[in-house]
Design a protein with these regions (language model features):
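Single conserved hydrophobic/aromatic residue that forms the stacking wall/gate
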Residues: 1-11
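A glycine-rich helix N-cap at a beta->alpha junction
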Residues: 12-24
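Hydrophobic beta-strand scaffold residues
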Residues: 15-17, 99-101, 131
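Short beta-strand scaffold segments in enzyme catalytic cores
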Residues: 29-33, 169-172
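Conserved phosphate-binding/catalytic loop of the ribokinase/pfkB sugar-kinase fold
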Residues: 32-83
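A generic structural signal for short hydrophobic patches within well-formed alpha-helices
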Residues: 58, 76, 106, 137-138, ...
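Conserved phosphate-binding/catalytic region of the ribokinase-like
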Residues: 90-91, 146-253
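Conserved phosphate/ATP/ADP-binding segment of small-molecule kinases
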Residues: 95, 107-180
Length: 253
């Protein structure tokens, strides 16, 4: 298991639950054009290894060690990962540990539109925070009226729902009210990483005790920075860069 110890040394993460999977399963390939205008990105996902997450992997995790659990909707797109994630969400919900999901819809692997909707709605019932864009809420509702689905679910268990609308900004729903936030005007070179960047800025801000408004602004700023840089995780700003960007550009919101 030297490979997993190496991961732990590099990324400073617990690796006890890591395991090798059959070599027939693959990591994903991303192909991105380097031209600035009208660029296209392609994610090739054939037998991806991350969808091999199973219930045995979940059983190795002591969820009591964590302040919250974050779920990517991509993990719901195929088995055995889908069932493993549903099991994990129910376990953490029973433990009263905050659950967060990025709906993170990808069109591949899903069997049908009906299954997409059924699975998304099942797991959304367990969540404390739901984050998704207009397309993803449409998919979850199997309709073109995803905004209404967000309004329905804020009356259920979730305490916060973020409904992202691309260049039009985002709506943030709570039990008490609905707020809308704009975006920062930047020259993007690619969309890759914007969602992860928003999530990182938004959730880390809430974790550090900031207001929902500040969290939404920091999430949007984080995303705006990342789309102007090459790469994804390597493009993420540090806190100093984020604060500087917000101070220089907040008047746009």
């Amino acid at each position: 298991k030297h490979w997993s110890r190496g991961l732990g040394d590099v990324y400073k993460r617990q690796v006890e639950h890591c395991r090798k999977v059959n070599k027939s399963f693959q990591t994903q390939i991303a192909v991105v054009e380097t031209i600035l205008k009208n660029n296209q990105s392609i994610l090739y996902r054939s037998n991806p290894c991350d969808l091999q997450l199973n219930k045995e992997d979940i059983n190795k995790i002591n969820f009591n060690n964590y302040a919250a659990v974050f779920i990517s909707g991509t993990a719901l797109s195929g088995e055995p990962s889908r069932n493993a994630v549903l099991v994990a969400s129910k376990l953490t919900s029973d433990l009263k540990i905050p659950l967060i999901i990025d709906l993170d819809y990808r069109p591949y692997n899903w069997e049908s539109d009906t299954i997409k909707s059924d699975v998304y709605k099942e797991i959304m019932n367990e969540m404390d925070i739901i984050i998704g864009n207009d397309l993803e809420f449409n998919v979850a509702d199997n309709s073109t009226n995803g905004l209404e689905l967000a309004k329905v679910y804020i009356k259920k268990k979730p305490s916060v729902i973020v409904y992202k609308m691309g260049e039009e900004g985002s709506k943030v729903f709570t039990k008490e009210n609905e707020s809308q936030y704009g975006t920062f005007n930047v020259e993007a070179i690619k969309p890759t990483g914007a969602g992860d960047a928003f999530n990182g800025g938004f959730i880390s801000s809430l974790y550090n005790g900031l207001s929902l408004e500040d969290a939404a602004i920091r999430g949007s700023a984080n995303a705006a920075i990342v789309v102007t840089r090459v790469g994804c995780s390597s493009a993420m700003p540090n806190n100093q860069e984020l604060e500087k960007f917000i101070n220089q550009n907040q008047k746009e919101l």
